Amino acid sequence: MCAQDAFQTQRSQLVELLVSGSLEGFESILDRLLSREVLSWEDYEGLSLVGQPISHLARRLLDTIWNKGTWGCEQLTAAVREAQADSQPPELPSSWDPHSPHPARDLQSHRPAIVRRLYGHVEGVLDLTQQRGFISQYETDEIRRPIFTSSQRARRLLDLATVKANGLAAFLLQCIQELPVPLALPFEDAACKKYVSKLRTVISAQSRFLSTYDGAENLCLEEVYTENVLEIQMEVGMAGPSQQSPTTLGLEELFSTRDHFNKEADTVLVVGEAGSGKSTLLQQLHLLWASGRAFQEFLFVFPFSCRQLQCLVKPLSMRTLLFEHCCWPDLGPQDVFQVLLDHPERILLTFDGFDEFRFRFTDQERHCCPTAPTSVQSLLFNLLQGNLLKNARKVLTSRPSAVSASLRKHVRTELSLKGFSEEGIELYLRKRHREPGVADRLLCLLRATSALHGLCHLPVFSWMVSKCHEELLLQGRGSPKTTTDMYLLILRHFLLHASPLPLATHGLGPSLIQGRLPTLLHLGRLALWGLGTCCYVFSAKQLQAAHVDSEDLSLGFLVLAKRVVPGSTAPLEFLHITFQCFFAAFYLALSADTPPSSLRHLFQDHRPESSPLARVLPKLFLRGSRCREGSVAALLQGAEPHNLQITGAFLAGLLSQEHRSLLAECQASETALLRRWDCVRRCLTRSLREHFRSIPPALPGEAKSMHALPGFLWLIRSLYEMQEERLAREAVCRLNVGHLKLTFCGVGPAECAALAFVLRHLRRPVALQLDHNSVGDIGVEQLLPCLGVCKALYLRDNNISDRGICKLVEHALRCEQLQKLALFNNKLTDGCAHSMARLLACKQNFLALRLGNNHITAAGAEVLAQGLRTNNSLQFLGFWGNQVGDEGAQALAAALGDHQSLRWLSLVGNNIGSVGAQALALMLEKNMALEELCLEENHVQDEGVCFLAKGLARNSSLKVLKLSNNHISSLGAEALLRALEKNDTILEVWLRGNTFSPEEIEKLSHQDTRLLL
């Protein structure tokens, strides 16, 4: 009773201790009490209710323990003391039996140690338990609710194991045995703890506000952050016809993927075009870590900006890099550094903007000493290779064009940041505009102007639309179509806000620009100098040299650089790299110092630095070009190709007829503008013709094919920015190809608009292949103007839904030339079936429809079959990787029985059994045109094969029958052999991956060589 009396007198202090920490700490106390059988399972359930205030739960716990007597009170006191001391739970005993006859009891008695071991692995274990059928999707989603930490998710999984009687507890015992033993935290000394705390504080302060795109206001990142589409990048050439679309990840799954280019590497590469949200993604990662909400497997996070790193000219060591250029330890720096060296697996380093690092990656110079000074590029390259801090995880962001093959050798996983989905655009605008009706009006505007909607898939454009929403909604101006239109709109917005009120009524007229022309030219000269010298952050001295003063800075286009070491002077940078390119283009368009002849460097595809020798000897090539140092030509020659492409597109837009008249009133000589326009026009036309001349001749019997590269796409975008039909017509008048291939080229909606603007002037029909891009529904809409010159359109793996395809089909019905559509690996469902059926019924010259790897079921197949009944032209129908089942197979077979033109039918992986096989067999008896039937990866089995054998015996057209992976035994094979005796037409029957023994395979192979086993 004495212990109980003491317990009662300390009740208020115990309540305070229990509620002073987090819910995580409270639950760890429950773990200890449950494992020691102080609490029964019923007690625990009443104390672990989600959503209850922790103070309420604490008082209920004290009441429960009081009723258990002295021993219970002593155990609770001990558990609270252990939690206060942050002592680690004991590890699982060496006598641990993963095959225990009482698995649920063992999970409970060792619960604290099991929670600790599951920490860091709970997501993988959850996936495994769901795959094995132990828990449902609903239960998985409940456990993965965002409010739960990893430890809390582990506890919820253990709770399920206690109440489920389906073998989950036994399965978890075995899983836990295989998990690695967690490292005991070696970071108990005060210096290390204080450093971790300081790191979190510094990174939280740097990450909390999103000011990269706006110098006028600070946006709270948590309030506006919107997930981008993040996909695992496939290797070019590795995607087979049946491969599924790339996996889409959430940010918190950044390190969870098992798709590795190089399992020995430590670097995760995130690629994305300028404005796709790479920097913001890293900023959100940093904030999640600093606030303790994610990525807690890392105890140390070190963020770096490549554009700032390249400014470091003095040799430095890794220790200097981490401490002096990120965060300095206030206590025991040597002890802290030793901990970092001893435990690199607890470290995450992020490097943002590798495309802005002027040094080209090389793995020739090896540097392994963490305390020896070396150049900043050597330090970075050896960190990425793992020569320094091996096993520390690194995240590197870059534009795709800056990533070389030699760098990719050291990449563990490559992820592609695609920008916003349509849902993401809406979510972002609603977060930015919470006033009633504003977001709705903006979204209506976007949906009514597909060109602007297409631009908004890049977050930088969504920000611009949000920033300029008043101009877009209230002033009645024509909606922007091109990138240049959008940047001129944001320029107008900033100028109006910096101008006296009377000027605000004049719009973006000559007076508004002319009044700030000196400022714009100062910024333009600084931007161009920065591009030419690969400088993207500017010191006060550099600003002074460019004559940029405080009045120029007041416009807001230059903002303080992020990730600056505390206590140092922050340099300035443009809002975004695209703004730097825009101002450089503005300077090139209006400055009297710009010779028109120098503009050719913007549009040359074969620049000297593109050759291997030029990369080795860049200074030699620059001298050989005889450009005066600091001249426009010299700066353009020194700029990175991807920045030249953006600048060239902006210049083309500024010199377009629409915008040239605006700029002419700010320029003393209109003749100078016309000269520059003429130079850009000639350069674009010449560069395109060089592309066309480089096309190899067609192979005998094949159409002439052009595999375009991203550089070609930028030339097309520049033509689109100029918005001149005559120039587009002249540019492609000599393009004589039958097949234009633009796969893996980063084609999004904006690029689709540019392609359609130019390609619609082709004189001959072309097969346009846009596989493995980011076209989406909006991009499909942008392509419609050029559909009339397409004889085939390939849109594999482009995130297209029913809405986009229905619009495409509606337009295709009026396009006589279009004969082939390839739409596999998208998001199509039964909702598009009526449109597809109408296409087949109405276009009697249509030859090929490929719909593989979508989400079409029997209902969709039945609708499509209606169109097939009246079609007399289709030769290829691809349905692999859907879910048509037996009913869908029956509907298709009934429609194809009398079809006179179909030669190839694929129903691979459609869950077709013997019933569907019987229907297809009846179709084979009637159809005398089909030459290849693909039924791999179904459930045909012997019964279905016997039906097919009967149909085969009466068929005289089929040449190839594919039945691999269908659970067929020798019984089914014997039926096929009997049918083959009566059929001389069939050339191949595929039976690989079925249930034959080695002896049966050898025997069957000798009986008929047409059986491929």
UniProtKB/Swiss-Prot annotation:
Start and end residues of each stretch annotated as Required for CARD9 binding: 214-247
GO molecular-function terms, A-Z: actin binding; ADP binding; ATP binding; CARD domain binding; Hsp70 protein binding; Hsp90 protein binding; muramyl dipeptide binding; pattern recognition receptor activity
Annotated Gene Ontology cellular component terms: basolateral plasma membrane; cell surface; cytoplasm; cytoskeleton; cytosol; extrinsic component of plasma membrane; Golgi apparatus; mitochondrion
Lipid tethering residues (S-palmitoyl cysteine): 368
GO biological process, one term: positive regulation of gamma-delta T cell activation
InterPro entries listed in its UniProt record: CARD, DEATH-like_dom_sf, Leu-rich_rpt, LRR_dom_sf, NACHT_NTPase, NLR, NLRP_HD2, NOD1/2_WH
Major localisation: membrane
Location of the motif ATG16L1-binding motif: 36-50
PANTHER family associated with the record: NACHT, LRR AND CARD DOMAINS-CONTAINING (PTHR24106)
General function of this protein: Pattern recognition receptor (PRR) that detects bacterial peptidoglycan fragments and other danger signals and plays an important role in gastrointestinal immunity. Specifically activated by muramyl dipeptide (MDP), a fragment of bacterial peptidoglycan found in every bacterial peptidoglycan type. NOD2 specifically recognizes and binds 6-O-phospho-MDP, the phosphorylated form of MDP, which is generated by NAGK. 6-O-phospho-MDP-binding triggers oligomerization that facilitates the binding and subsequent activation of the proximal adapter receptor-interacting RIPK2.
Family membership noted in the UniProt record: Belongs to the NOD1-NOD2 family.
Protein name (Swiss-Prot/TrEMBL): Nucleotide-binding oligomerization domain-containing protein 2
Organism: Bos taurus (Bovine)
